[in-house]
UniProtKB/Swiss-Prot annotation:
Name this protein carries in UniProt: Metalloproteinase inhibitor 4
NTR domain ranges (all copies): 30-156
Keyword set includes Transferase: no
InterPro entries linked: Netrin_domain, TIMP, TIMP-like_OB-fold, TIMP_C, TIMP_CS
Length: 224
């Protein structure tokens, strides 16, 4: 059974950890491990659809000697897909000011809607960065939008393995091979947009393409 996301420490500590983990010589780089949209949703504490109302640069902590800054985005939450048990209506989200610490730049005061995934810090604030799955809503496929309601959450017990080169094989029956990078040289290609890694009644997992009807073994899992 997938574990619930653990509470994340305060943002000042999180910023320091990001700075320490940044590789030497890559002062302006933000490096993230690849993850399928399904993995992002499963590993995040919350997933919401929202509009950005405004932004403001704020101190990362109350310590006057701390030079770190954060961007506080005021948002209008449209729909919550994950995180009900931890937060209700979200008014603000926070991200590092520096792009080298994976800070996210979002368009404020526009009609653009976003899918936002992120962490909930120990003080209750919502923290997002470039290693989360953050996409303009209009860029999501029909399957991705529908899967935010059901399929992604219900199949967090499946493991998705990124395939970079051949040979590339699974090591367990609950794995799905993610081949977008191998075939298209980009992460969010056709497979990320149109497939979900779904669990069968026997515990194994395989890719399900959204435009095809669900097979009985999938239905038995989703509707016991």
């Amino acid at each position: 059974m997938p574990q619930s996301p653990r509470p994340v420490p305060s943002w000042a500590l999180l910023l320091r950890l990001l700075a320490l983990l940044r590789p030497p010589g890559l002062g302006e780089a933000c490096s993230c491990a690849p993850a399928h949209p399904q993995q992002h949703v499963c590993h995040s504490a919350l997933a919401i659809r929202a509009k950005i109302s405004s932004e403001k640069v704020v101190p990362a902590s109350t310590d006057p000697a701390d030079p770190q800054k954060m961007i506080r985005y005021e948002i209008k939450q449209i729909k919550m897909f994950k995180g009900f048990e931890k937060v209700n209506d979200i008014q603000y989200i926070y991200t590092p000011f520096d792009s080298s610490l994976c800070g996210v730049k979002l368009e404020a005061n526009s009609q653009k809607r976003y899918l936002l995934t992120g962490q909930i810090l120990s003080d209750g604030k919502v923290f997002v960065h470039l290693c989360n799955y953050i996409e303009p809503w209009e860029n999501l496929s029909f399957l991705q939008r529908e899967s935010l309601n059901h399929h992604y959450h219900l199949n967090c017990g499946c493991q998705i393995t990124t395939c970079y080169a051949v040979p590339c094989t699974i090591s367990a029956p609950n794995e799905c091979l993610w081949t977008d990078w191998l075939l298209e040289r980009k992460l969010y290609g056709y497979q990320a947009q149109h497939y979900v890694c779904m669990k069968h009644v026997d515990g194994s997992c395989s890719w399900y393409q959204g435009r095809l009807p669900l097979r009985k073994e999938f239905v038995d899992i989703i509707q016991p």
